[in-house]
Amino acid sequence: MELPVRLVVGLGNPGEKYASTRHNVGFDWLDRLASSQRVAFTLETRFRGLCARIMLADTDIWLLKPQTYMNASGMSVAAVCRYYKIVPEQMLVVHDELDLQPGVIKLKSGGGTGGHNGLKSIVADLSSQVFWRLRIGVGHPGDRNQVVDYVLHPPRREEAALIDEAIDHSMQVWPLIARGDFAAAMQRLHTRQEN
């Protein structure tokens, strides 16, 4: 078993303009988790983000939706980590993933940023790549010149349904992730998608 999770970061952009876009699936995932735990987000100006707290086995787990816009997410994440003395290995970042098809979710530790500006910002501000990522597939437009426009638009109805279903499944795996049983979480999460 790894270290239990103490911080879950959902990546996205603030404001109605970006709500329901592919780039905001990290926010959507975190909203679903907060709703299931019956907690609400409040603005914490010192962290430049919307925060909530849940408890699991007498451990505080902080939920964070940075309000800095994607490219500066690391500033918000680093502030929370410093304040609560959370090391990167105790953090899960939930984000959109172009390299996975809609409906596919993968859990992994460390690795590169895959060109994701939110991840780049977090890596730069924490000086570490060693944190857990829950990668939610949104598909790829097929042309890298169309990526920015693609992620800043909502998924098509059938893609949204697949993403929703995958998020629902990942919520069933959440307790394993939270307590640091990542091997079991990956097995359950990834096996379902191979059938």
From Swiss-Prot:
Which PROSITE patterns does the annotation name? PEPT_TRNA_HYDROL_2
GO annotations under biological process?
protein quality control for misfolded or incompletely synthesized proteins; rescue of stalled ribosome
Sites binding tRNA sit at: 18, 69, 71, 117
Note the site residues: Stabilizes the basic form of H active site to accept a proton. 96
- Stated family: Belongs to the PTH family.
Tell me what reaction this enzyme catalyses. Answer: an N-acyl-L-alpha-aminoacyl-tRNA + H2O = an N-acyl-L-amino acid + a tRNA + H(+)
* Pfam families registered for this protein in UniProt: Pept_tRNA_hydro
Q: Which SUPFAM superfamilies does the annotation name? A: Peptidyl-tRNA hydrolase-like
Q: Which HAMAP family match?
A: Pept_tRNA_hydro_bact
What Gene Ontology molecular function terms does this protein carry? Answer: peptidyl-tRNA hydrolase activity; tRNA binding
What the entry lists under InterPro entries is as follows: Pept_tRNA_hydro, Pept_tRNA_hydro_CS, Pept_tRNA_hydro_sf
Organism of provenance: Nitrosomonas europaea (strain ATCC 19718 / CIP 103999 / KCTC 2705 / NBRC 14298)
Name of encoding gene: pth
Positions of the record's site feature: Discriminates between blocked and unblocked aminoacyl-tRNA: 13
Lineage of the species this protein comes from: Bacteria, Pseudomonadati, Pseudomonadota, Betaproteobacteria, Nitrosomonadales
Name this polypeptide is given: Peptidyl-tRNA hydrolase
Outline what the protein does. Hydrolyzes ribosome-free peptidyl-tRNAs (with 1 or more amino acids incorporated), which drop off the ribosome during protein synthesis, or as a result of ribosome stalling. Catalyzes the release of premature peptidyl moieties from peptidyl-tRNA molecules trapped in stalled 50S ribosomal subunits, and thus maintains levels of free tRNAs and 50S ribosomes.
User: What keywords appear on the UniProt entry?
Assistant: Cytoplasm, Hydrolase, RNA-binding, tRNA-binding
Give the matching PANTHER family.
Answer: PEPTIDYL-TRNA HYDROLASE
Show the active-site residues.
Answer: 23
